[in-house]
A protein has these predicted regions:
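Metal-dependent phosphohydrolase cores
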Residues: 1-129
Length: 129
């Protein structure tokens, strides 16, 4: 694994984990996902608000980009499972191809917010006149 992740600074935890989110329940994250989740670049999302300054109006509206990232990954997995169960993914065939695609999608979900800085979406709520 070290050769794959190269020089990424990793925390000591590298095994797979079960993570419990209050609104989405308990979910499994694999070893390679935890190796990325435990990097500083993803862990810093714990300190960036997903909702920007909304908590000034709604004091309990506190949600971090880290929580959002885990939620997106879990929701993606639920969507994949639903599509798989109803046969919508049959065109992918069987074997390792669908597993590889799901793995890539999950990693994309984990990494999708790492480039955001605080309040980066705040401009989306401004009205243009």
């Amino acid at each position: 694994m070290e050769e794959f992740y190269g020089e990424l600074p990793l925390y000591d935890i590298r095994e797979s984990k079960i993570i419990n989110l209050a609104n989405l329940g308990t979910h499994h994250f694999f070893e390679h996902e935890m190796a990325v989740i435990d990097t500083h670049v993803v862990q810093r999302l714990k300190y960036i608000s997903q909702l920007g300054p909304v908590y000034n109006v709604f004091p309990t509206a506190r949600h971090t980009r880290f929580e959002h990232t885990l939620g997106v990954t879990i929701t993606l997995n639920k969507m994949w499972n639903s599509l798989s169960e109803n046969g919508s993914l049959s065109f992918l065939g069987t074997g390792s191809k669908p597993r590889k695609i799901l793995s890539d999608l999950r990693m994309s979900a984990i990494l999708h917010d790492i480039g955001h800085c605080p309040f980066s979406h705040a401009h989306m709520f401004q009205k243009s006149f």
